[in-house]
């Protein structure tokens, strides 16, 4: 328990505690007077008895976050998330609040920090095209989301008493919906597409709701298009890996991601990154996606062409068993497909969208076809939760909204108007055929 000590006319509350690193330490807390010391002593003892006592710590925010990254980040973040989150910490957290004591960082300090971020120069300004001069609201939102997660762990580890990053005042973020093609626009694009690789990629992305990294990592052992599969309407893909380009220094840092293979892509300049074939993102489990017969036949024909090329090239062909690859068997990167797609749009004067938007179009179209079956759509897209489908992919197309308005008019307002008309005509017929009732109504109206 705590005790009160008077030393040279000053009062101290003295107590022992187990520190964050497991060591037994003694703490002396100075008080202004004896009354304050009594109050402080009782407060500490009550917190200990109620098991809410927090061991005092001089740990800085930077020190805590480094522990957080080591214990939490390496186990829960994918390669891309790890790079992005550590970048946010190095650029916008450590320089501004890294030396602050974590236990004394209050909700007021949080709002002051956010306000300071809005006036902080963007590290990419002048480096990347169209980068804003100051930290954008979306970046601030990402920083706060990361710190909210960190403080949640700090609360769990009994480092702080509350999560000060909950309900903080964020700057307004203007959310822009991603432009997507309608099914009609996709049909038109496929009709005029002469690039065989791009043609197949568009079909796979739209019909199977694939991410571009999953699409390019698809291997023939996960494609089921044999005759018996067609007979049973069981043509399908298994999605269990993806292609990503990562920093070479990241390999071996994380324990969460399993890297199956690294590729040397023979770039002209020395590169700090490497293309890897790896497991799915965010603890993603392998998923089965059933494919339309037309797409299955496309794949069957594509495989025949690929086998013919293998025979011609012989040992020159680098067989990685990839469905989408260059003629020599080497993998195609997402930037290659994105550039092809962008050029295809420009040459044919099509509405500008990015390749990833085909996945959005796919989810939207499947939701419409299934009349809102979110779980079935989620099974194809591979999203972690159904809520992500409703938030990200349930775009409402204007044509459907007009149809809904027309249906509402016909089913609600028009029917009501007809009912009112019917009621009036029915009453008139009753009066015509009932002389006594008609005379009684005349007398009532004359009063």
Cite the ranges covered by each PLM segment.
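N-terminal DNA-binding recognition helix of tyrosine site-specific recombinases/integrases
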Residues: 1, 92, 103-108, 123-167, ...
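Short, polar N-cap/turn motifs at the start of nucleic acid-interacting alpha helices
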Residues: 223-231, 236, 333, 352, ...
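Flexible interdomain linker/hinge and immediately adjacent N-terminus
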Residues: 111-113, 156-190, 327
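C-terminal catalytic core of tyrosine-transesterase DNA break-rejoin enzymes
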Residues: 156, 203, 207, 214, ...
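Conserved tyrosine-mediated DNA breakage-rejoining catalytic core shared by Y-recombinases
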Residues: 7, 185, 218-308
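Long, amphipathic, Lys/Arg-enriched alpha-helical "connector/arm" segment
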Residues: 127-129, 173-198, 207-210, 272, ...
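N-terminal DNA-binding module of tyrosine recombinases/phage integrases
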Residues: 6-108, 304-318, 398, 413, ...
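Catalytic-site neighborhood detector that most strongly recognizes the C-terminal catalytic loop/helix
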Residues: 172, 180, 231-232, 243-245, ...
């Amino acid at each position: 328990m705590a005790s009160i000590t008077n030393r040279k006319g000053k009062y101290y509350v003295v107590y022992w505690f187990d520190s964050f690193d497991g060591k037994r330490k003694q703490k002396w807390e100075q008080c202004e007077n004896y009354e304050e010391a009594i109050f402080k002593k009782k407060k500490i003892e009550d917190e200990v008895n109620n098991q809410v006592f927090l061991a005092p710590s001089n740990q800085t925010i930077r020190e805590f976050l480094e522990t957080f990254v080591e214990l939490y980040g390496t186990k829960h973040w994918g390669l891309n998330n790890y790079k992005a989150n550590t970048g946010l910490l190095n650029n916008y957290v450590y320089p501004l609040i890294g030396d602050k004591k974590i236990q004394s960082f209050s909700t007021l300090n949080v709002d002051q920090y956010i306000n300071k971020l809005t006036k902080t120069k963007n590290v990419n300004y002048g480096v990347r095209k169209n980068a804003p001069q100051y930290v954008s609201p979306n970046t601030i939102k990402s920083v706060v989301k990361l710190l909210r997660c960190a403080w949640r762990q700090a609360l769990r580890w009994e480092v702080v008493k509350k999560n000060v990053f909950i309900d903080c005042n964020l700057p307004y973020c203007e959310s822009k919906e991603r432009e997507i093609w309608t099914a009609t626009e996709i049909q038109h694009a496929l009709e005029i597409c002469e690039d065989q690789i791009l043609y197949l990629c568009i079909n796979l992305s739209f019909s199977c709701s694939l991410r571009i990294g999953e699409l390019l990592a698809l291997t023939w052992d996960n494609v089921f298009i044999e005759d018996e599969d067609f007979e049973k309407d069981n043509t399908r893909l298994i999605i269990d890996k993806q292609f990503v380009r990562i920093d070479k220094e990241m390999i071996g840092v994380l324990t969460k991601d399993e890297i199956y293979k690294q590729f040397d892509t023979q770039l002209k300049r020395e590169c700090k990154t490497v293309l890897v074939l790896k497991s799915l993102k965010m603890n993603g489990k392998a998923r089965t996606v059933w494919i339309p017969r037309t797409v299955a036949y496309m794949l069957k024909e594509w495989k025949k062409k690929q086998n013919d090329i293998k025979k011609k090239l012989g040992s020159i062909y680098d067989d990685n068993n990839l469905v989408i690859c260059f003629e020599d068997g080497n993998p195609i990167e997402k930037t290659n497909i994105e550039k092809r797609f962008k050029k295809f749009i420009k040459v044919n004067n099509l509405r500008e969208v990015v390749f990833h938007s085909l996945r959005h179009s796919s989810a939207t179209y499947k939701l419409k076809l299934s009349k809102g079956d979110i779980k079935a759509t989620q099974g194809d897209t591979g999203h972690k939760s159904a809520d992500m489908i409703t938030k990200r992919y349930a775009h409402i197309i204007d044509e459907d909204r007009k149809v809904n308005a027309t249906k509402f008019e016909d089913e609600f307002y028009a029917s009501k108007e007809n009912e009112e008309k019917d009621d009036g005509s029915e009453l008139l017929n009753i009066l015509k055929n009932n002389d006594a009732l008609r005379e009684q109504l005349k007398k009532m109206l004359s009063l």
